Regions:
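Conserved catalytic-core motifs of GNAT/GCN5-like acyltransferases
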Residues: 27-35
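Glyoxalase I/VOC metalloenzyme domain signal
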Residues: 1-4, 8-28, 45-67
Length: 67
């Protein structure tokens, strides 16, 4: 079995990305906003998987319920 990614809901994607970058020595991070889903995303690229940090951008975002 292989894990492609793990998604984590966060209050602030920039702060959380910095924390994970520092803790895990991650160099490759990309950010995007998906307006249709109401979410800001940081994708932290690891050697064999990715960590996706998800920040809701509005109260109707499906990510909001996980915080």
């Amino acid at each position: 079995m292989k894990i492609n990614h793990v998604a984590i809901a966060v209050e602030n994607v920039e702060d959380a990305a910095k924390t994970y970058q520092d803790a895990l020595d991650i160099k490759n991070v990309e950010f995007e906003t998906v307006e249709s889903e109401g979410v800001k995303v940081a994708i932290l690229h690891l050697e064999n998987a990715n960590i996706e940090l998800l920040e809701p951008t509005n109260d109707s975002s499906p990510i909001r319920k996980f915080l």
